[in-house]
Regions:
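Glycine/Thr-rich phosphate-binding loops of Rossmann-like dinucleotide-binding domains
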Residues: 49, 280-281, 343
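Single conserved hydrophobic/aromatic residue that forms the stacking wall/gate
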Residues: 332-333, 340-343
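Cofactor-binding active-site loop characterized by glycine-rich and histidine/acidic residues
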Residues: 2-194, 200, 205-214, 221-226, ...
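Glycine-rich ThDP/TPP pyrophosphate-binding loop and its adjacent helix/strand module
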Residues: 159-165, 174-190, 195-329
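Proline-centered helix-kink/hinge sites
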Residues: 268, 337-340
Length: 344
């Protein structure tokens, strides 16, 4: 992850609200994996700034590589992304068998055999499999056998892809929760990114199960009576799901580290990113202070930064890492605009 910000972002000119807390997460993920990522995007803010016809902010690099993005419905996005993963898995399995056939052929040259073997050795590694794929295609290009021609014809499916499912808290905590739970429980190598604004942002700021107790918003004008649903704890209860809670403005290093670890983990992962929204009604400057609001949320103890890495448990280490420090409660005020008072 060192030097990640020198990489080309494959998300640009999104048209999101000025200061949006969601787009920095998506932009960062495209910098890390954009040349080989698939995105299934739930309906909501992230699908509006993510693809408002006839334009899309997702772009390509100099090689013509970029995120493959699609949107189904609000309620089935997790299942939709899961289907994308299974389809890619099935195609790659067939292509792998064809590469094995070529590698075992007596007619294959030493160069072709070496390229095939390197591809097979890196088959499950997204970082190294891309270069191995380029070498394989170059070695097979021009070969006359039907198997080689089919491999080259389907070259876009050869490299290991990074499968992502994007959506907001209204989708992940409420309407699409059943699908999110199903996908995480599957044990498959898939990544879920939740842009947590703690309300239904795209439809005007209604309360969701991600809204915290006391939060004032539509359908909760007197303050939400029930506490926030702990999606992270639910996912951690499985024991084999990588889970992280991040806030890019508060701790960029932790955010980048967790995103990289989640993608590298050979199983399901869930990342919940705190995303201030203009509907939060941030005083004195509004979304100019988006990143500062993330810092305040973490410093006060309102939003904790942590990760749960099952790979550490297998190595005999504590899988849970708490990055944020003890909260400073003096930063939290009673929600009374005329007389805000510290709660401690």
């Amino acid at each position: 992850v060192k030097g990640s910000q020198f990489k080309q972002p494959l998300l640009e000119f999104s048209g999101a609200c000025a200061g949006c807390g969601e787009t920095p997460y998506a932009k960062l993920i495209t910098q890390l994996f954009g040349d080989r990522m698939y995105i299934a995007n739930a309906t909501g803010c992230s699908s509006i700034w993510g693809n408002s016809s006839p334009s899309t902010p997702y772009t390509i690099n100099s090689k013509g590589q970029g995120p493959a993005w699609s949107n189904s419905l609000f309620e089935d996005n997790a299942e939709f992304g899961y289907g994308m993963l299974l389809a890619q898995k099935a195609i790659r399995k067939r292509l792998k068998e064809e590469v094995e056939t070529v590698a075992a052929s007596e007619q294959a040259s030493a160069e072709v055999k070496a390229a095939c073997q390197e591809y097979l050795d890196t088959f499950a590694c997204g970082i190294t499999n891309g270069d191995a794929t380029d070498k394989l295609v170059a070695a097979l290009d021009g070969c006359d056998c039907d198997t080689c021609k089919d491999i080259v014809k389907n070259k876009d499916f050869l490299a290991k892809k990074s499968q992502w499912i994007f959506g907001g808290d209204g989708w992940a905590y409420d309407i699409g929760f059943g699908g999110v739970d199903h996908v995480l429980a599957s044990g498959r190598d898939i990544n879920v990114m939740v842009f947590d604004t703690e309300m239904y942002s795209n439809t005007g700021g209604q309360a969701s199960k991600a809204s915290n107790i006391g939060e004032v918003c539509q359908f909760a004008a007197a303050g939400k009576e029930m506490k926030k649903k702990s999606l992270a704890e639910i996912a951690m209860s499985y024991g084999y799901v990588y889970v992280a809670q991040i806030a890019l403005g508060a701790n960029p290093a932790q955010a980048v580290k967790c995103i990289a670890e989640a993608e590298a983990y050979p199983g399901p992962s869930l990342i919940i990113g705190y995303a201030p929204c203009e509907l939060h009604g941030i005083a004195k400057g509004g979304m100019n202070h988006c990143q500062d609001e993330m810092k305040k949320a973490v410093k006060s103890g309102y939003w904790n930064l942590f990760s749960f890495d099952p790979a550490k448990k297998e190595a005999g280490k504590n899988p849970f890492t708490l990055t944020s420090k003890e909260g400073d409660l003096s930063l939290i005020h009673i929600s009374e605009p005329t007389r805000p008072e510290p709660i401690s």
